[in-house]
Design a protein with these regions (language model features):
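Metallo-beta-lactamase
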Residues: 50, 101-102, 178, 255
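Small/polar (Gly/Ser/Thr/Ala-rich) solvent-exposed segments
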Residues: 104, 123-150, 158-169, 175
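Amphipathic alpha-helical coiled-coil segments
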Residues: 1-3, 21, 39, 57, ...
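Residues on the lipid-exposed face of transmembrane beta-strands in outer-membrane beta-barrel proteins
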Residues: 61, 152-156, 255
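Structural signature of outer-membrane beta-barrel channels/translocons
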Residues: 53, 122-124, 155-159, 258
Length: 278
């Protein structure tokens, strides 16, 4: 993380100035100064590596979006908690089952299959048609009719060579396949949504714990720095405190990142993600 390594470098350089001052005054040995310099060199390598990874990821993202590799990216969404997760896992599952477009497609296919069954079965039923005829026998236009005929025609399919039964069987088979796909899709959506919900909840709790660890690491470094400055602690203790602080910040930002990703996965699973998502 570029921000974490940059912050760690600033802290280590400040501590190096303190160690240099104590060395010049004869309070610490040269090995302390050298250890601090080695530590800073290691942090500089970490910072350069973080910057390199960022540029590589930026180029890959540009390529995936069809932009030029050198196109600068300016993220507009900060790595902070912008919204909490509300509702229970069952609520999210119900939303997913009603919002996911895949389920809408299968429900539409189910309706079509049922209509095909009804259509094929209608071939067994009699077909009734009404006919009529109306004539006016006059040289002039008039309001009365001299002749009219009304009738009905009934057609009964006595034998179709099992054609209708086969059509019905095929339609029922299609309905069974669609309903089986619905069950499988529904189960998959439930599992996916539950997993995304639990991951988001876990990441949110990790943020809380990581924030406490950051505060503790900051306070620990302050205490250790004062003790070292007063000659009550070795350079090893100071460097360990710096590393603990750096790791605490890394864990905190990783938890924030994981929560963001989990939120996206949850919204995708529920079928509710849109361009306004943050």
């Amino acid at each position: 993380n570029i921000m974490v390594t940059k912050q760690a470098l600033e802290t280590s350089n400040a501590n190096l100035n303190m160690i240099q001052s104590r060395y010049n005054s004869g309070f610490v040995v040269k090995s302390d100064l050298l250890r601090a310099m080695v530590h800073i060199a290691d942090l500089e390598q970490q910072h350069l590596l973080a910057e390199s990874r960022f540029k590589i990821n930026e180029a890959m993202l540009n390529a995936s979006m069809g932009f030029g590799e050198a196109n600068p990216l300016n993220p507009v969404t900060p790595l902070t908690i912008r919204s909490e997760i509300h509702g229970t896992v069952d609520t999210w599952i119900d939303t997913a089952l009603s919002k996911r477009p895949e389920m809408d497609t299968l429900r539409l296919e189910e309706g079509i299959a049922k209509k095909e069954i009804a259509k094929s079965q209608s071939g067994h039923y009699p077909d009734v048609s009404l006919i009529g005829n109306y004539e006016i026998n006059s040289e002039d236009f008039g309001d009365s009719a001299d002749n009219y005929t009304l009738g009905a025609v009934v057609r009964v399919n006595i034998f179709s060579g099992n054609r209708i039964s086969e059509e019905t069987k095929a339609a029922k088979s299609m309905l069974a396949r669609v309903q089986e796909m619905q069950k499988s899709m529904e189960l998959g959506i439930k599992v996916q949504t539950r997993e995304a919900f639990l991951k988001a909840k876990s990441a949110r709790e990790r943020i809380r714990v990581a924030k406490i660890a950051v505060d503790q690491a900051e306070e620990g470094l302050r205490i250790v720095k004062n003790r070292y400055n007063n000659g009550l602690l070795t350079i090893v203790g100071l460097l360990d405190a710096e590393l603990a602080r750096q790791q605490a910040h890394t864990n905190y930002f990783k938890a924030l990142h994981d929560y963001k990703v989990a939120r996206v996965e949850l919204e995708l699973a529920a079928g509710t993600i849109d361009t306004d998502f943050q």
